[in-house]
Amino acid sequence: MSELIIFGRELEPRPVTSTLPDWQQADPRWISQALRRAMDKPGGGWFVVDDRRKFGAQPRRYRIDDRDFVFWQGKNGLLAASDTCPHLGASLSAGAVRNGCLVCPWHGLELGERPMGNWAPLPVHDDGVLVWIRLDDCGEQPTERPIMAPRPATYLDATVRMEARCRPEDILANRLDPWHGAHFHPHTFGRLRVIERSDEDIIVRVAFLVLGRLGVEVDARFHCPEPRTIVMTIVGGDGVGSVVETHATPIDDTHCAVIESTLATSDRPQMKYVLPLARWIRPLIEKRAARLWVEDVAYAERRCALSVADAQR
């Protein structure tokens, strides 16, 4: 393999914390303990749904926690409720939106912000990048807003959504194992080593490949602000403050959605020229993220299958 060529801001030397090979550093006990700590954190009852750009004039249906919900644009913003019409059970997402109200496709019943029987709109939050829904019956203490990690003030964002045959915890476990990065994704990571690890987070020095063996090296911190999210934040090198948020939302007992948002920023003056090009740059970021997640979904699904098989023995 040809030599890695690094450009960008030079990072301060960090002492080698371990000379063990990656397979020994990737301690299953530490990963399991870190995952358990993350899953024990409060979630506020909030679940990420999708990229806010996906919600337009037509109603959209999403299955979350084994229930179908419909999202539509009301007069005062995005609304969400059960996709089942309270009249005779039609799928409301197959209907239309008129003057901020859902119109049932079977009988023309109009539903809006007011409850009807057991049917009622649920709390929705648009954070500027993602849409969240709050399920007050999921067993968590509700919070007014989602529990989120800090984001940069100015950024170029891109989001991908994929579905996987696994549990949210399998998605988090994948990200709590950064040691696999350069081995499983050699097309994206030129090299990677863990430089700091605690009970709550892990910091890696990683070289992202840009073109061939040309890469930019940064220090990145991984931590879980709530039980269905893990965030990577650039803490050293170019792009300090940039984040990659990976959210795992249960679809049902055997499937979950992976929603990953990249919020890229830079203090370099060239950033002001990059932001107006977002519509052309965004698909490139999404394509690279999707490629990674095709592989990482396979990792998570394999982990889930082995876990289920062990539990059945």
Roles of regions detected by a PLM:
Residues 145-313:
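C-terminal catalytic domain of Rieske-type non-heme iron oxygenases
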Residues 42-51, 106-107, 175-177, 226-231:
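Short Pro/Gly-enriched beta-strand edge/turn motifs at strand-loop
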Residues 48-148:
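Rieske [2Fe-2S] iron-sulfur-binding domain
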Residues 2-65:
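Zn-dependent metallo-beta-lactamase
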Residues 45-49, 67-69, 90-91, 118-123, ...:
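Short small/polar-residue motifs
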Residues 43-46, 57, 75, 128, ...:
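Sequence-level motif detector for i,i+2 pairs with an aromatic at +2
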Residues 40-42, 64, 117, 126, ...:
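A generic structural signal for short, non-catalytic loop/turn and secondary-structure boundary residues
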Residues 17-28, 117-170:
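Short flanking/linker segments adjacent to small metal-binding domains or redox-active Cys/His motifs
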